[in-house]
């Protein structure tokens, strides 16, 4: 009878454990779907991180019966990590392939790394508690964090005093982030002297000293102490050099299926890179391939104090160096840079924490192409950075011939076949090529090509009542890139910067993109009997609008809105459709 009671208690306990596990998995999936705004974002996240979760694991109700064979266990994340640790400890190569009993090669479950460089000043205990919760959430979402401590603010003349200070701060940080003996807390370990420096270049002595804690679910915290091989002594190294050294070691000493660096995060009290356009608040998104030199120049025009400017310049340069290196070595642009404040990292709401939100969606909390002058666009202290895509812009300022499509084709600046294929693919229709090119050939205002024809925009000059008005004739993104973050914003931002004074475009009334357009325009209109919705924007609408038509002539500082809308309607309704 007692044996039956024991089995009954065990069965009830297993049911309760199963319910807790199932609820946790359900809540995780629901939170992912809630935080991602499109089905494609949710799918992209789950495709990348699905192996980090054991969604298909069933509770083993009978622990005396082994229902999983070796092949099944080696497809499991935790089993693979245990195998890698044993290989490390046995001094064998952990990066070699994994096979089952039938010598079938198994896919490895990679570590998805996020490297955090934390500036250890002005972080309150309350913020540390929030930061700890953010790390827990990131781990739940499949991220393996690595923390690097930034002590660059310390004087460089006393190693001993600095070392004592760092030990004290490191111990405090261990307490802030959690104690390993407590089940629900983070597991963290403090590491030092992992690097040897030769001629100022740090190299990682032992990759396993970082990977083993990660495989055990422990967050390594790296102190910026290195062994100087030239001077035979320990010393501090600038955190930015250490960040590049760590990224280099992780990229160069690994196989592509073992780990990936997903995020490079700088936690700095000063926040993201300031933008003049956004009234000194942060750039929302930076496409380094296109914007790096311009933003660097902007920082030096005197709108911020030199000591603050130097910090932002240093952060931007470091991000550019690290992301460019990773891009070159890995051959992809999957690594994202994030610069934000301790206060913002401590926010524990997925949609408001830019780090968590970026893990889920790979984009910023708001769109970078939203107009910064409107009250409905929030101002942020976070900058999202990508190595990004190359951008080609052709307009009258950078082309010394007559700006026609035929000249751009003849000079091989624009590939006609690729452009037409992009337009056909983007719109899902066949372009009526000759009539279309004949219509726009002599009216080109700007042509934008992004990447290898991943996206494009064609802006033409259209005429009404003796005035020429910029018209967004084509805005195309390849189907494989539609719904992906950043690309549409990059193109549309260039469009607005190219024609800031006045721009119009049209879209079919049933186009699902119209909501996106509406958020980026000054206004829109549509006639009941028309198939088109007409959008307009530009600095011209910063002027006073003469709604009562008391000024028949267009005076300086006043815009006759009735006349403008008539012009826009005449242009947009008069252009023949381009597709068959």
From Swiss-Prot:
Catalyzed chemical reaction(s): L-glutamate + acetyl-CoA = N-acetyl-L-glutamate + CoA + H(+)
Gene3D superfamilies: 3.40.630.30
EC numbers for this chain: 2.3.1.1
GO cellular component: mitochondrial matrix
Subcellular location, record wording: Mitochondrion
N-acetyltransferase domain location: 403-560
GO function terms (MF aspect): L-glutamate N-acetyltransferase activity
Record has Transcription as a keyword: no
CDD domains for the chain: DUF619-NAGS-FABP
Pathway where it operates: Amino-acid biosynthesis; L-arginine biosynthesis; N(2)-acetyl-L-ornithine from L-glutamate: step 1/4
Biological processes, Gene Ontology terms: L-arginine biosynthetic process; ornithine biosynthetic process
Keywords carried by this UniProt record: Acyltransferase, Amino-acid biosynthesis, Mitochondrion, Transferase, Transit peptide
Domain of life: Eukaryota
Keyword Acyltransferase: yes
Pfam families according to UniProt: NAT (PF04768)
Similarity comment: family membership: Belongs to the acetyltransferase family.
Function: N-acetylglutamate synthase involved in arginine biosynthesis.
Name of the protein described by the UniProt record: Amino-acid acetyltransferase, mitochondrial
Originating organism: Candida dubliniensis (strain CD36 / ATCC MYA-646 / CBS 7987 / NCPF 3949 / NRRL Y-17841) (Yeast)
């Amino acid at each position: 009878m007692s044996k039956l009671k024991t089995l009954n208690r065990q069965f009830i306990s297993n049911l309760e454990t199963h319910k807790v596990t199932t609820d946790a998995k359900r809540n995780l999936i629901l939170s992912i779907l809630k935080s991602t705004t499109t089905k494609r974002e949710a799918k992209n996240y789950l495709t990348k991180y699905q192996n980090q979760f054991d969604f298909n694991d069933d509770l083993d109700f009978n622990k005396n019966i082994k229902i999983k064979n070796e092949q099944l266990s080696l497809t499991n994340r935790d089993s693979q990590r245990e195998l890698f640790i044993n290989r490390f400890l046995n001094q064998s190569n952990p990066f070699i392939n994994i096979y089952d009993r039938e010598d079938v090669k198994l896919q490895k479950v990679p570590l998805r790394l996020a490297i955090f460089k934390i500036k250890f000043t002005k972080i309150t205990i309350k913020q540390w508690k929030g930061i700890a919760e953010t790390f827990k959430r990131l781990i739940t979402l499949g991220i393996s964090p690595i923390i690097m401590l930034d002590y660059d603010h310390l004087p460089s003349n006393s190693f001993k005093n600095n070392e004592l200070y760092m030990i004290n701060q490191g111990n405090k940080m261990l307490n802030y982030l959690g104690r390993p003996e407590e089940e629900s807390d983070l597991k963290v370990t403090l590491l030092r002297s992992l690097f040897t420096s030769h001629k100022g270049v740090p190299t990682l002595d032992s990759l396993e000293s970082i990977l083993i804690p990660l495989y055990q679910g422990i967050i390594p915290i790296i102190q910026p102490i290195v062994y100087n091989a030239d001077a035979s002594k320990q010393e501090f190294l600038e955190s930015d050099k250490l960040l590049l050294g760590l990224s280099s070691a992780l990229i160069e000493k690994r196989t592509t299926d073992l780990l990936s660096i997903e995020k490079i995060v700088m936690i700095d009290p000063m926040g993201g890179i300031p933008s003049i356009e956004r009234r000194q608040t942060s750039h929302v998104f930076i496409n380094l391939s296109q914007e790096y030199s311009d933003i660097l120049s902007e920082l030096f025009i005197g709108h911020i104090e030199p000591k603050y400017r130097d910090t932002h310049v240093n952060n931007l340069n470091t991000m550019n160096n690290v992301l460019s290196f990773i891009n070159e070595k890995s051959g992809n642009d999957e690594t994202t840079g994030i610069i934000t404040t301790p206060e913002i990292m401590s926010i524990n709401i997925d949609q408001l924490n830019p780090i968590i939100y970026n893990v889920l969606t790979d984009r910023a909390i708001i769109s970078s192409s939203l107009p910064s002058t409107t009250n409905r666009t929030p101002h942020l202290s976070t900058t999202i950075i990508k190595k990004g895509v190359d951008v080609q812009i052709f307009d009258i300022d950078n082309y010394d011939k007559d700006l026609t499509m035929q000249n751009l084709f003849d000079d091989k600046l624009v590939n006609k076949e690729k452009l037409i294929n992009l337009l056909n693919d983007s719109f899902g229709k066949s372009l009526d090529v000759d009539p279309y090119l004949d219509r726009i050939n002599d009216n080109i205002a700007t042509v934008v090509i992004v990447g290898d024809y991943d996206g494009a925009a064609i802006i033409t000059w259209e005429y009404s009542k003796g005035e020429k008005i910029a018209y967004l004739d084509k805005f195309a993104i390849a189907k494989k890139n539609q719904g992906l973050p950043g690309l549409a914003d990059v193109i549309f931002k260039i469009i607005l910067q190219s024609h800031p004074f006045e721009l119009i475009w049209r879209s079919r009334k049933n186009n699902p993109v119209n909501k996106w357009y509406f958020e980026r325009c000054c206004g829109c209109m549509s006639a009941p009997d028309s198939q088109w919705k007409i959008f307009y924007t530009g600095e011209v609408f910063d002027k006073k609008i003469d709604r009562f038509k008391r000024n028949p002539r267009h005076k300086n500082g006043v815009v006759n809105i009735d006349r403008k809308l008539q012009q826009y309607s005449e242009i947009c309704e008069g252009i023949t459709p381009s597709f068959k």
